[in-house]
Regions:
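Conserved class I S-adenosyl-L-methionine
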Residues: 1-38, 49-57, 70-75, 79, ...
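Conserved Class I S-adenosyl-L-methionine
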Residues: 2-6, 20, 47-49, 165-255
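Conserved hydrophobic/aromatic "anchor" residues
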Residues: 4-7, 13, 95, 100, ...
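Class I SAM-dependent methyltransferase SAM/SAH-binding core
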Residues: 39-93, 102, 117
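Acidic/polar helix N-cap motif
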Residues: 92, 96-97, 114, 170
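A short SAM/SAH-binding and catalytic strip from SAM-dependent methyltransferases
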Residues: 101-115, 138
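Conserved catalytic/acceptor-binding region of the Class I
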Residues: 116-117, 123, 127-198, 214
Length: 255
């Protein structure tokens, strides 16, 4: 997994993506049907948005989590000191075959170095009859949480890397990756969250923290280009307070 743009503080990560990933996690866990008594794994846990929901459903002792970012692993370890949290990419999970009843990856597959291998590893560590599930933002359909940002960026710089070509972000592609990884009877769906922004700065400032491709793009700009992008985003968005909606594709399969 590519952690170059995610070796950041938990505060920065939370301000940038946590406002969307928190509410998404509740819906995602409901979709998967995680139940008390199950052993579950959070692949690419980040600062712990999905982890927190899993802990609330099955208890700390039945959740494990991995992430390639050491700083984010330490955040989750601190929050859940008795939980098994390890630094690892998805492509080589440090668990025996069939260790978990459910293995989930929220907003991770599109950043895996090798998504097919990562999904296959998720399946390997799932017990027979268990569930493998993933979600990714609809960047290709321009319905993700960063769509307004990338639309503004590309209006000024057509070469801006808007994440629309990442693995799994187009409708149906996440399910295709599951199939290539060897999973069958893959169910696809979508989930949508709505986030309130009390001011433009509340929306904009997290983009300046260097998180993910969008944050890396902003920090790569000189002051004039950054100010121009900020102004273009302000022109694009409604007057504050305003809401943004974000849709994620999901794929789910039983092993």
């Amino acid at each position: 997994m590519d952690d170059v743009s995610f070796e950041v503080s938990a505060d920065a990560y939370g301000r940038f993506m946590g406002r969307f990933s928190g509410p998404l996690a509740e819906q995602f866990v409901d979709l998967v049907g995680v139940e008390p008594g199950q052993r579950v794994l959070d692949v690419g846990c980040g600062s712990g948005a999905l982890t927190a929901v899993l802990v609330s459903r099955v208890g700390m002792g039945r959740v494990s989590a991995v992430d390639p970012s050491e700083s984010l692993v330490e955040v989750v370890r601190t929050a859940y000191p008795s939980m098994d949290v390890q630094r690892s990419g998805a492509e080589s999970l440090p668990f025996p075959d069939g260790s978990f009843d459910a293995v989930l990856a929220q907003l991770v597959v599109h950043f895996m170095t090798d998504p097919v291998t990562g999904i296959a590893e998720m399946a390997r560590t799932t017990t027979p009859g268990g569930v493998v599930a993933a979600s990714v933002w609809d960047h290709a359909g321009h319905k993700g949480p960063l769509s307004a940002f990338w639309s503004a960026a590309r209006s000024l710089d057509p070469s801006a890397p808007d994440e629309s070509d990442l693995p799994g972000v187009a409708e149906g592609h996440l399910a295709e990756l599951f199939a290539v990884a060897g999973l069958t009877d893959v169910a696809s769906s979508s989930l949508t969250v709505t986030v309130e922004h009390p001011s433009f700065d509340d929306w904009w400032d997290p983009f300046t923290l260097g998180v993910g491709p969008a944050g890396a793009y902003v920090t790569s700009l000189d002051d004039a280009a950054r100010d121009a992008l900020r102004d273009r985003c302000r022109q694009t968005l409604p007057n504050a307070p305003f809401r943004t909606r974000a849709t994620a594709w999901t794929a789910l399969a039983h092993v």
